Design a protein with these regions (language model features):
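Repeated scaffold domains used in trafficking and secretory/extracellular systems
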Residues: 102-107
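Short consensus segments that form the blades of beta-propeller domains
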Residues: 56-71, 96-100, 128-136
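Acidic, small-residue rich beta-repeat scaffolds with periodic aromatic anchors
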Residues: 2-40, 125-197
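Acidic/hydrophobic-patterned starts of short beta strands in beta-sheet-rich repeat architectures
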Residues: 44-55, 111-124
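N-terminal "first-domain core" detector
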Residues: 12-81
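Solvent-exposed serine/threonine-rich low-complexity stretches and specific carbohydrate-binding patches
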Residues: 89-96
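Surface-exposed loop/turn elements that mediate protein-protein interactions on large endomembrane-trafficking
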Residues: 78-89, 145-152
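A short, structured loop/turn motif at beta-sheet edges
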Residues: 109-118, 146-152
Length: 197
């Protein structure tokens, strides 16, 4: 399983900004950094970790042949510093398009399971305004368990929590308005507390 392989390590140059560092080690040559590169002082016992999200597109394949369509993706990575300015690169997840390219709205930490560690939350949205008669965004939050042994993993473990499904916030083609309950990190954290986490 990929989640149990060792993570790749990369050297961060002296004085190199977090943006230049993650741009230099991007996973796909055509990838662009999406949003802000986050360098977090503390996540449980991990200090100065970096979170980066890369947007890219790939040609679609059907039955082994190109289908003439391009699909967009956003890949998330966690970079954990080790000794001598080296960083372990751990894959978070891929967020595929849902009618549009995923946009990472928020990266946050909250308790989402029964242990004391805070988990990683990633809130994504997808613009739906390109569909005739529809105006708004789809929202989905993803949770990932805190990696207790970072030297033995290459991918974060996702956590499923009931009640945090895809939600539409906007107006559908019948003119009906929907409001997403969980379209901000603050609302998600409040619900996690209500659930007893």
């Amino acid at each position: 399983m990929a989640g149990y392989c060792s993570a790749q390590t990369f050297q961060r140059n002296i004085g190199e900004s977090k943006e230049d560092f993650v741009k230099r080690i991007k996973p796909v040559q055509s990838a662009e950094i999406q949003g802000e590169v986050l360098e977090v002082k503390q996540w449980n016992n991990l200090a100065n970790s970096i979170f980066a999200f890369y947007e890219y597109s790939e040609e679609g394949i059907e039955k082994g042949k190109p289908n003439g369509l391009n699909y967009s993706y956003v890949d998330g990575y966690l970079l954990i510093p080790s000794e001598n300015n080296r960083y372990k690169k751990i894959f978070i997840d891929t967020y595929a398009e849902e009618g549009a390219t995923a946009y990472v709205e928020s990266v946050f930490f909250a308790n989402a399971d029964r242990d004391a560690d805070k988990e990683l939350g990633v809130l994504c949205s997808w613009d739906q305004s390109m569909h005739y008669g529809i105006s708004g965004r789809i929202y989905q939050v993803y949770f990932y368990d805190f990696p207790k042994a970072t030297d033995k993993i290459s991918k974060l473990k996702p956590i499923q929590i009931k009640g945090f499904d895809f939600e539409f916030d906007g107006t559908n083609d019948a003119g009906e308005r929907s409001v997403a309950k969980f379209n901000t990190a603050a609302k998600i954290k409040a619900e996690l507390k209500r659930l007893g986490f």
